[in-house]
């Protein structure tokens, strides 16, 4: 799901005084390009650009804390470089560039409910922003940077978790259920497959060596509160990425009640209500 309110911006410029590219993230110069280097090199290869450039990225929400900052961040960089160098890349080429930096980034190029096809890495919007106007309530339980990144965590899990293979083998079945639920706007089915897939992913991480424990006590309190609301008849479900933050999806008519209930949980740092959002786009040509 692409959302509004939480977003990343990117600005690109030349700097002839430098010998190599520079990435500035949230006003802090990074020691290297890190995971975005393959994306930068791929994009610059279209015009054989050799001059060093400066990429300035800003996330308006905590970075590397389980809120998909790499997805939105890489997507914004792809759009910025495509415009700066006048590459005029196709949608498929933009997706190819984004996925080199983050496996989640292609989805942030598109609006609404987005499907990334594993066969050819094509990407498409299944339902646009206004076609199924659900609410997403983000419960931030920590702003700390993860001790183990999602990418490194996945590598560890692949090598050490006895549940990894079964989780991967279930993905086709889960994605088909999710696609059916989204296309038919079956809220209960989408909630069922989303929560089940989330639980399986965290089972894989927590059975890795060393165990990858991303959820905290407040995360579990949020889950318990969600279960109570669901039992009382509220249309609601949750998902949690590789981090401690809880994302609640609910019907618009229940949003105020959900927020009120979640405020009763101790140690929640912030509760953010968002809608489905637009894909990555150019906002300033200057």
What residue ranges belong to the model's regions?
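Residue-level signal for inorganic ion chemistry
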Residues: 10, 190, 241
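Short Gly/Pro-enriched turn/cap motifs at secondary-structure boundaries
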Residues: 1-2, 128-130, 238
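Short cationic amphipathic helices and targeting signals
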Residues: 238, 243-250
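ATP-dependent small-molecule kinase catalytic core of the GHMP/sugar-kinase superfamily
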Residues: 93-234, 249, 253-286
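ATP-binding N-lobe of GHMP and related small-molecule kinases
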Residues: 1-65, 79-89, 258-261, 272-286
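Gly/Ser-rich oxyanion-binding loop with an adjacent helix/lid
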Residues: 48-130
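Short, flexible, solvent-exposed loop/turn segments with mixed acidic/basic and small polar residues
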Residues: 12-15, 234-240
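Catalytic-loop motifs flanking and including active-site residues across diverse enzymes
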Residues: 35, 73-74, 174, 218, ...
């Amino acid at each position: 799901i692409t959302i509004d309110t939480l977003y990343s911006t990117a600005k690109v410029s030349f700097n002839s005084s430098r010998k190599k590219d520079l990435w500035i993230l949230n006003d802090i110069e990074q020691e290297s390009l890190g995971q975005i280097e393959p994306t930068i090199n791929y994009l610059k290869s279209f015009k054989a650009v050799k001059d060093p450039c400066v990429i300035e990225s800003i996330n308006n929400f905590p970075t590397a804390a389980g809120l998909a900052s790499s997805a939105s961040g890489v997507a914004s960089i792809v759009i910025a470089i495509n415009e700066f160098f006048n590459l005029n890349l196709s949608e498929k080429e933009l997706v190819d560039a984004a996925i080199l930096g983050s496996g989640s980034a292609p989805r942030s190029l598109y609006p609404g409910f987005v499907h990334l096809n594993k066969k050819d890495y094509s990407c498409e919007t299944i339902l646009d922003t206004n076609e199924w106007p659900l609410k997403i309530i983000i419960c931030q339980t920590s702003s700390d940077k993860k001790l183990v990144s999602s990418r490194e965590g996945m590598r560890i899990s692949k090598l050490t978790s006895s549940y990894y293979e079964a989780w991967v083998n279930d993905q086709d079945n889960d994605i088909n259920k999710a696609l059916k639920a989204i296309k038919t706007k079956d809220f209960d089915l989408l909630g069922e497959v989303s929560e089940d897939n989330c639980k399986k992913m965290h089972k894989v991480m927590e059975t890795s060596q060393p165990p990858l424990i991303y959820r905290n006590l407040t995360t579990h309190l949020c889950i318990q509160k969600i279960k109570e609301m669901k039992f009382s008849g509220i249309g609601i479900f949750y998902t949690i990425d590789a981090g401690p933050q809880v994302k609640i999806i609910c019907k618009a008519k229940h949003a105020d009640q959900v927020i009120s209930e979640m405020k009763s949980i101790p140690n929640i740092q912030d509760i953010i209500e968002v809608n489905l959002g637009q894909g990555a786009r150019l906002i300033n040509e200057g």
